């Protein structure tokens, strides 16, 4: 709903032509190929999780004469490399450190009888070729500690 609202409110020149959901009946590849056949002028694809992004990257990589910008969600190894290679335009990264921290605070507050907010936003970050190798990512990319030498992954 948020994705559609953002397009509708702030990007009226962008047409949302297809929404596909991962299911057991049809592979991501098959859904994507059907959508691209129906909408051959597709300029971009937004993927809502790491597995879908990896499948889309693989499928689009096999297509000839297709210039499609792929935007992912999460930041697995395949996505990080795809951003560096220019195959993925960018990704919205979750903040695992912030998620863990917020969960610990919420658990402690609940255990001590305090109220816990109904909505907790642990943060996220846009990552693309311009900032993929910047060290100050505040724990957003998984395995950050190993990649950038940070302590405890933050």
Q: PLM features: residue spans?
A:
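Extracytoplasmic substrate-binding proteins
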Residues: 1-13, 17
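Hydrophobic alpha-helical
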Residues: 3, 17, 21-82
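Hinge/cleft segment of the Venus flytrap/periplasmic-binding protein
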Residues: 6-10, 98-154
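Short, structurally constrained coil/turn elements
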Residues: 10-13, 38, 64, 120
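Conserved beta-strand segments of alpha/beta enzyme cores
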Residues: 15-17, 69, 90, 125
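Flexible loop/hinge segments that line or gate small-molecule binding clefts
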Residues: 76-89, 130, 136
């Amino acid at each position: 709903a948020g994705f559609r609202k953002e397009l509708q409110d702030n990007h009226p020149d962008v047409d949302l032509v297809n929404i596909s959901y991962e299911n057991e009946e049809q592979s991501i590849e098959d859904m994507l190929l059907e959508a691209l056949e129906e909408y051959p002028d597709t300029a971009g694809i937004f993927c809502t999780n790491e597995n879908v992004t990896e499948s889309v990257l693989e499928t689009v990589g096999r297509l000839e004469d297709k210039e499609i910008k792929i935007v992912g969600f999460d930041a697995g190894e395949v996505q990080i490399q795809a951003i560096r290679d220019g195959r993925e335009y960018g990704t919205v990264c979750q903040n695992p450190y912030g998620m863990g921290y917020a969960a610990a605070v919420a658990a402690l507050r609940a255990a001590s009888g305090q109220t816990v907010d109904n909505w907790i936003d642990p943060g996220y970050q846009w990552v693309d070729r311009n900032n993929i190798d910047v060290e100050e990512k505040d724990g957003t990319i998984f395995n950050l500690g190993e990649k950038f030498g940070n302590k405890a992954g933050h």
